[in-house]
Amino acid sequence: MNLKNREIQACTIIDGIQDELKSISLFLHNNPELGQQEVRAVQTISRYMEQHGLDTTVGLTTCPELRTAMRSDIGLDRLHKMAFLGEYDALPELGHGCGHNLIAIMSMGAAIAFSQIARDTWGTTFFGCPAEETIGGKVFMANEGLFKGYDGALIIHPGGENEVGGTSLATHPLEVTFHGRSCHIASLTDSGINALDCAVDLYQSIKMMKQDIFPKEAIVGAIFTQAGTAPNVVTDKATLRMTVRGATVSDLEDIILPAIKAEANRIATSYGATVDMHHYEPLFKDMRQDERLVSLFDEVMTEFGESPRKLPPDEADGSTDVGNVSYEVPTAQPTLNIGNQLEAHTPEFACAAGSTYGLDQAIKGAKIMAVVALRYAESLEV
């Protein structure tokens, strides 16, 4: 069977299961679960993948962060293997305001179709990746080596327009806590050390460093999570929690974060305070989109009537744990329009993720991904 016929057959397979996939997506949409709590989602998806001949494992490795991670495999003894990345965690209050219920069925449909068409020469894995919105399940999956040995990893994200290419920002959230010494604000002994002054000075210093020291792509967002309990008492403990982003892991880990930590230590010393620092979420690496896969998504999305905007390799929008996958295996994550100019993480986007149009677009996305996988597979076999 030639490539064109295999592509047609893959799309026919997805058409044949589209009602079931849409039903699963609506179930996820109507029963949103936060990261690391996606029990019903995993049960539903794993049962369905097993019905289509893929061996499924829930809870990957002994890593506690991967209790709701899963994988569905077939043909892992083949020379080549393709990974399809699914997500299913929701957002607090908004539910599926990032459309992970659609991501799940796009990758499920593509994996099922690819596994049936390419099973003689290719292994297939659907990875269920938990907690993208919080701890980043793929970070831990990559650290555990789960993506090693794959020839490609594919995922499509719903959005407000069609896009291919680009990158994502590296991020490594940081919490800084200053410890001072409490006393009454009117104490004549002047024995207090104001931890809040330290935190405020660090906040102001970061604003200046963004202008003078950091690379231009650096982004730091910060809030005070502890700032004292009474206005007439010198604050003995103050905490600044921040998301810190850079264009690359190198910029972030070698320039931006060391500068912030050094400044925190300098400020603490100048006041006679002490300081504790820790990363409260893991490192999300920048995305290294594979140009071959980007070109194929550009080509196939256009053929399906979804001509994408091609982003420059250095254009970034937010951060994602898919970046960590891209350091391990050739990866691409295009964006498929489910509502013109809609912004993710909004009530409107959550509605679109459960709409008839959103579901129809997800079925189209599954077909696009399956066709890209087949063309990419053939290019590696030549």
Show where each model-derived region lies.
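Short coil-to-beta-strand
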Residues: 78-84, 170-177, 236, 332-334
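Hydrophobic/aromatic beta-strand patches that form the interior of the parallel beta-sheet core
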Residues: 82, 127, 152-154, 330-334
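Buried hydrophobic packing segments
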Residues: 45, 106-114, 137, 199-206, ...
